[in-house]
Amino acid sequence: MKLIEAIDNNNLKEVIRIIRSDNINLESINDEDDLSPLHHAVSRGYKEIVISMLEHGADVNLCNDEVCSPLHIAIKNDNVEMVQLLIDNGADTDCCNNTIHGTPLQCAILNENYRITDALLESGADTHEIYTKNHPIIEAIKLDNLPLVRLLLRHGADVNTFDPLYGYPIHLAIRYGNIDIIKELLYHGVIESYSLYPSLLHQSIMCNNKEVVLLLISMGFDVNAKDNEGNTPMHLAVQKNLVGIVKILLDKGADTSIINNLSVTCLRSCYVYGNNSTEILQLLISRIVINKYANIPCRSIAGMNYNWSLIESNQKTNSYKLECEKEILKMLDVKIGSRSLFDIYLNKIESNMLLRLYNKVTLPEFIIYKDIIINAVYTAKERESLISKSFTVLEDTISNDTIDNLWKNIPIEVKYMILRYLGKDDLYNIVNSV
């Protein structure tokens, strides 16, 4: 075909001459390549020829037999300028007649082309409607592409839209484990609980993603939330034999007394499912025992009593309970004044006092509760470091004469006492102020 040959040669004059003299139908589709002349020119990236053809009446939204528009072709070729040219000449940014190519927006997202996606969105491309099988926000999450997710959210993509195959965007992001995308979705108003779907914390445990579990707990998600079967995150972690997540949940205050709809506690789950390690069983028992000694409130008295009877009814678990009690008594024996090492579990002891107590500890004597002690010591050292740095910052930066004289006249011990009243965030603010 002469016109196609002229386009291939980028011969604008010949293209114009053929169109005018041969009375060419610009909407005809070539049987060999399934392209119209405009499709062909766009695929070649010849802007001047495309402009001329549009001026001569070529349909900017003409679709070939595969239902692919010129805009789709420009997007697949990552040709930003051509995309903008077609949009400026009336290209439909939501054009889609089948499930193969999707909308131009979906096509741009699949190509992971940020600039083209931005151009389409600025021109009003629809972020909500699902013309094919996936929403644009779902596609961006599947690609693990944070910039595209942010771009879509900025243009109003619905974070609570439902996809029949992938569910809600937040559930998909949790399955993929992208922390930054999860944060973005939560920031933009994700509903924390969907009917017929597990809570976000349950979902993260089902995916065995410790980082996501920690993120959600840090953002205030209830560590003791129940799913439709009454299972808490701890029930689920025990059932799935996830030792690391069991440790996290215990450290974050998971209540082992809660019973599910079948009146089963998480401890009982160890026996019901029969696939759990001795480590999980001992983790639960050790926490149940220390919580009882510390008088930690629980949500279910019946569940607590059931756990206790379950432990004492078995020789091995009862023997382990006695070992736990021995270590607790050792912690109570390590004292300075009225404070004991056991107080670290209740968070009733200042960091400097805790470190003094730790100097009296023979750590190998504590096998069961060693991690609790080590974690408390780490936190105490971190806090002492913050206090020390805050003191240095204040000493170096207070310059006003009146304030300076007042500060210098305060005894060092009192200055440190003042700093000890501050929370972690306040101390960080002081340290980061210079």
UniProtKB/Swiss-Prot annotation:
Coiled-coil ranges from the UniProt annotation: none
GO molecular function, one term: aspartic-type endopeptidase activity
InterPro entries in alphabetical order: Ankyrin_rpt, Ankyrin_rpt-contain_sf, Peptidase_A2_cat, PRANC_domain
Protein name in UniProt: Putative ankyrin repeat protein FPV219
PANTHER family membership: ANKYRIN REPEAT AND PROTEIN KINASE DOMAIN-CONTAINING PROTEIN, ANKYRIN REPEAT-CONTAINING PROTEIN-RELATED
ANK repeat start and end residues: 33-62, 66-95, 101-131, 132-161, 165-195, 196-225, 229-258
Pfam families in the cross-refs: Ank (PF00023), Ank_2 (PF12796), PRANC (PF09372)
Keyword Repeat on entry: yes
Protein species of origin: Fowlpox virus (strain NVSL)
Domain of life, per lineage: Viruses
Keyword Mitochondrion attributed: no
Swiss-Prot/TrEMBL keywords: ANK repeat, Repeat
GO process annotations (BP): proteolysis
